[in-house]
């Protein structure tokens, strides 16, 4: 389990994404406006921590996944970070999450006039993160009623 000190020592250079056309209009709240990305508006601790969780658990796929948008995914990562940092990092912005996903190599798919976006992220890796990091607690009636994902030999990506 990572700690706050671990995240403080991470030092990924997010400034390399300034000027990226696919990030035009990205601010902390998400895609709003038309200005170029200004990395100084983002919290580096939150960016590095979110990036670490993403790299550890989420996997890219060929197609864009329209089941979960950036806003819903950022809540999952927030939950993990709140647990790992004892509540010090308990909120990350939508824009921070989007930039962290982009820095991990995920493609962005935007919808017109929406501050949220979708990514080419594996549903299986999202489910793995939800179940195995305690975001969703499953309490079956009988011990044999666990979802098949928990018994799948290929769930570890």
Give the ranges of each region predicted by the language model:
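Intrinsically disordered, low-complexity serine/threonine- and proline-rich regulatory segments
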Residues: 1-52
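Charge-enriched amphipathic alpha-helical scaffolds
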Residues: 80-111
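A diffuse structural propensity rather than consistent per-protein peaks
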Residues: 3, 64-65, 69, 90-93
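Phospho-regulated, low-complexity intrinsically disordered regions of nuclear gene-regulatory
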Residues: 114-157
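Positively charged, polyanion-binding regions of nucleic-acid-associated proteins
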Residues: 38-83
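Generic secondary-structure transition motif, activating predominantly at the C-termini of alpha-helices
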Residues: 11, 54-58, 62, 81, ...
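Feature of secretome-associated and extracellular-like proteins
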Residues: 3-25, 70, 79-81, 144-157
């Amino acid at each position: 389990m990572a700690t706050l000190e671990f995240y403080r020592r991470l030092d990924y250079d997010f400034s390399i994404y300034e000027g990226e056309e696919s990030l035009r209009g990205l601010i902390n709240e998400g895609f709003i406006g038309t200005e170029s990305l200004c990395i100084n508006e983002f919290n580096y601790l939150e960016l590095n921590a979110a990036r670490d969780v993403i790299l550890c658990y989420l996997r890219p796929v060929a197609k864009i996944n329209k089941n979960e948008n950036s806003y819903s995914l950022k809540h999952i990562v927030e939950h993990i970070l709140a647990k790992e940092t004892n509540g010090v990092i308990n909120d990350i912005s939508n824009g921070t999450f989007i930039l962290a996903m982009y820095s991990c190599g995920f493609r962005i798919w935007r919808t017109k006039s929406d501050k949220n976006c979708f990514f080419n992220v594996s549903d299986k890796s999202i489910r793995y993160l939800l179940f195995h990091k305690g975001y969703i607690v499953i309490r079956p009636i009988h011990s044999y009623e666990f979802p098949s994902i928990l018994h799948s030999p290929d769930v570890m990506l």
